[in-house]
Amino acid sequence: MTDSAEIASKITSLIGNDRVRTPRGIEPSAAVVIATPADAAEIAEIVHKCEADKIPIAAIGAARTLSEIRRTPVAIGISLERMARVAAYEPHDMTIVAQPGISIADLNAAMAPSGQRLPVDPRNPRASTVGALIAAHHAGPLRLSEGTARDLLIGIQYVGHGGQTIRSGGRVVKNVAGYDLMKLMNGSFGTLGIITEAAFKVRPAPGNYTLALAAPPTAAEAFAAACALCAAAPFAHLEVTSPRVSATLGLGSQFSLLAGFSGTRAEVDYLRETTARIIPDVQFLADADAMRTYCALRDFDFSATSLAAQIAVPPAELPQALDSCGTEFRAHAASGIAQVMTYDVLTAEAARSTILKWRGLVRNARGHVRVVHAAPEMRAALEFFDTPNNGAFELMRALKAAFDPAGIFNPGCFVGGI
């Protein structure tokens, strides 16, 4: 069903005319009609109706993820904009429970008076929601020291098949019931259900953030320096960027090493001394200058590229994998993860050939590739995810069939068209 008026009328009958609207901003690439339920009960009604009528749906926060990867818009986007508050916060227990539509920036602002934060740093946290953080497994440079949402999630609630509300885990760190279900929802891209609440463990917000910058002559020297730093001390993040990416960050057209660290004044002084001993020509930024450069690094915008993909390999294999790809990159040097990109004007077939080339090279390094940005006209020609071995793929298909037998949750947007 693609007729927007007919779709809208079906949802209006459930939640009212004021809760259904046309897409705006980047949403037209994600959905034909936008529904804005106020709570999990209204989402459950929509799911029940859409299963009966075979109408595909998908959760939408800022719509950024779906607008970047869907080949065609889903019939109904379930906007979580009305579900954007902190449900519970216990500073002494260091836990927080949030609705899926709240942005990471607003979530951390709520904890700032208590000196705490959710230590994940997806691109543009003002436009990155809790729901997308989990469903798309977003992460940034801090994954080196803090992990990802998968490591911090202690409880989850979502609406699934039949409009049922499913809960797993709890609101305290010691409660580990449902551990596997939380892992399953993480990175599922909304194909198993719609998240309505999430509980996280949080951590103290560190102070005195300092950024060390260096410009090694080659990528190999940049990665060697990052490896030496990683072995010497605990850094918050270690990034290596190619010349064009460095220029975008305001660092000049050169290979760049960006090493960030925080802590007490004594800890920061020690890390400065350690860094200077390993990289004699290093430059240090502090306070607003450090944060400005870090934010530019974290928020790097792939929309200026023609094609971008994320690769993940064993950390020791990353320098060679990037050299083989022969492209511009932003690399999380000690994590084995990087984004590779090209700025060349590509046809759909050229884009497909480029992704196949990257996949072959990365597979040789025992890794995998996921497309993170492609122009809409290219998407039909691309497989956004690697295809796993037959056993793993059959397991994924079985899980999809068990969790979403009607096939309405964000169909065709995951591995192998799941």
Where do the PLM segments sit?
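FAD-binding subdomain of flavoenzyme oxidoreductases
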Residues: 113-121, 125-239
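A generic structural motif
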Residues: 33, 250-262, 335-344
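Short amphipathic alpha-helix segments
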Residues: 6-12, 219-241, 311-327, 351-362
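Helix N-cap motif at beta-to-alpha junctions
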Residues: 40, 217-219, 261-268, 314-318, ...
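Conserved glycine-rich FAD pyrophosphate-binding loop
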Residues: 55, 70-75, 79-81, 108, ...
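N-terminal accessory segments
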Residues: 1-30, 49-57, 62-64, 362-381, ...
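Glycine-rich N-terminal segment of FAD-binding domains in flavoprotein oxidoreductases
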Residues: 24-89, 95-100, 105-120
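A conserved active-site cap/scaffold subdomain adjacent to cofactor or substrate pockets
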Residues: 215, 225-285
